[in-house]
Every structure is written in structure tokens, then in C-alpha cells.
């Protein structure tokens, strides 16, 4: 893998982490500010947070594996 490809992967990992952090913040805000009235929002926000965190974890693992292979 070229240094440019590794750099692009690292950038993707950072973007995925930022998105996961934003989703976690949305979940936190729901818990802190809008529950119990907005309880119906829990499944959608929780799923979006889970998906974003999983995407980050997969991107991070792929980047680390590619980095170790070089």
C-alpha cells in the first residue's frame, strides 16, 4: 500500500471517528435534555450511534492492519 493510500485511510478513520462522536453526542443530548418525553427517539438515535461506532471500528482496524503490513 502506498503512503498516499495509507494517508487516505487515516483520513477516513478520522472522519468516521468524528461522525461517531457526533452521534454519541446526539444520544447524550437525548438522555440529558429530552427524556423521558422523547423516549420514542431512542431506537433510531441508538442505532445510528451504534452504526457510526461500528463503521469507525472497522475503518480503524483496516487502517491498523494496512499500516502493520507496510
What are these regions (language model features)?
Residues 29-68:
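Short, charge-rich amphipathic interface segments used for partner binding and complex assembly
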Residues 1-2, 66-70:
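Short intrinsically disordered terminal tails
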Amino acid at each position: 500500500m502506498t503512503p498516499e493510500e495509507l494517508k487516505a485511510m487515516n483520513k477516513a478513520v478520522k472522519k468516521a471517528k468524528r461522525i461517531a462522536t457526533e452521534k454519541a453526542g446526539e444520544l447524550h443530548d437525548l438522555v440529558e435534555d429530552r427524556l423521558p418525553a422523547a423516549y420514542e427517539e431512542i431506537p433510531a438515535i441508538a442505532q445510528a450511534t451504534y452504526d457510526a461506532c461500528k463503521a469507525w471500528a472497522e475503518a480503524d482496524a483496516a487502517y491498523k492492519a494496512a499500516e502493520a503490513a507496510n
